[in-house]
């Protein structure tokens, strides 16, 4: 974390836009100043954290309220009068107390994995019920937030959790119970949509698949119910049963095959078959300038900016959160082709770090995340809350491929990382004392 802060400080000092690099005002307020705060919080929490039993209960209740508001907003129900003064077009993209649907999705990607893993790991029935209700609400909120980054992040996380717990039937029972309930909850959204006589916000192809009357989605619901029953029966016979390692390898192979299939589809429709018309979900496999609300164009130009940069900017970037300046020459084309006259970020956290803090900044950031995940896997068996935090960090990190860093939901991601690190340190210290 100190290495990341050092890069931020050096990048700010040598930036041509020093003041904006410090405050982040030219971008999303993610300048050097907020990184100083993040690092201070990191060292305070990782050294002084003391777990309170109901910390995550408060987390579940708070996030549950945000989820519920997002669902109500889907039906144009505005209990907090948040829509007052907004144009109709803005109301369509406004959700819960956060606003922008991409930021709501980012929030969900921090909270929902943690809630699901808390439910899977908690034996207290009351707490399990709280986490269960919150996770079902969270999935419904993910559907109505309707952000591609959120879908990618959470669905990828589901596959990783499947592989991690596949040998433990008692955990897999709760895993498939969660999936069944979340998928069923999405159908409840449809029931209320009918009751609302169609007065709801429009959904894109992915959430429409889960919410509306798609035959395959009902097959998924039935499949999760069957698997839930199978693992329940196995776990009832032996609560501590452990399936053979072959099951783990088979699950890992299936997940790897899914990943390779996605890569193949992307390569096929992006580089080989570039003319076939794609609609709905298949359209996500063709990466071009229009992809992801013209994120494809912004990504391509941002990478070109990096490639054309001098050696200093390649190493430490143009200054934290100052992408708007090197991107300014492309504003006219952005406006003529897509109707947006400006952008101040790459809409990809890693690409944004690459341009604004250089190779060193991106490497330091990735090292922070990767080192925590490695430690989390190592110490999770000693404290299940570690894997809860790791789930949040992984899900957020995946959705960040198509989202932005900002001081609204990113601090929550930092907090989960800090708590996870603190728990790892505590496990390590206990192990050292035991061995000493």
Predicted regions, residues:
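Alpha-helical transmembrane segments of multi-pass inner-membrane proteins
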Residues: 2-15, 31-44, 53-91, 96-238, ...
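Membrane-interface amphipathic/re-entrant loop segments adjacent to transmembrane helices
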Residues: 20, 91, 337-343
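Non-cytosolic membrane-interface motifs at loop->transmembrane helix junctions
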Residues: 22-32
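Luminal/periplasmic active-site loops of membrane-embedded glycosylation enzymes
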Residues: 88-91, 216-217, 281-298, 328-329, ...
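TM-adjacent membrane-interface loops and short helices in multi-pass inner/ER membrane proteins
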Residues: 100, 289, 293-342, 357-361
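Membrane-interface capping segments at transmembrane-helix boundaries
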Residues: 233-239, 424-433
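Juxtamembrane membrane-water interface segments immediately following transmembrane helices
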Residues: 265-284, 290-307
